[in-house]
C-alpha cells in the first residue's frame, strides 16, 4: 500500500526547488512538482509521497536520470537533502505531523 496524498502533491505548486543541483536548477517555481526520491516496492512503482521533494523540472530530470548530470550517488545526495527540506516545509504547512 502506497501513501498517496493529493494535498501534498498539490502543495508543490509555486514552491521553490528544494533540490538545487548546481549548474542544473532552473530556480523557476512555476516548474516545481513533487518528485519521488528512491524506489517503490516494485518495478515501475513510485515510493510514498512522504519520500519526495519539491523539485524544478531541471532537477527532476536529473533525479529521474532523463538527463545525465553527475554520478547517481551525487544526485541522490541532492535529492535526499531536498527531501529533508521538503519534509520541514510540509510540517510547517501542517500537511504532515509528528506524534507527540
Q: Where do the PLM segments sit?
A:
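Intrinsic-disorder-associated interaction segments
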Residues: 1, 76-79
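Short cysteine-rich loop/turn motifs with clustered Cys
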Residues: 2-33
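Short cysteine/histidine-rich zinc-coordinating motifs and their immediately flanking basic loops
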Residues: 27-38, 66-75
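Short linker/helix segments within small regulatory modules
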Residues: 38-51
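Alpha-helical and His/Cys-centered functional microenvironments
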Residues: 40, 64, 91
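Short Fe-S-cluster ligation motifs
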Residues: 49-55, 79-100
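Short Cys/His-centered divalent metal-binding micro-motifs
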Residues: 53-71
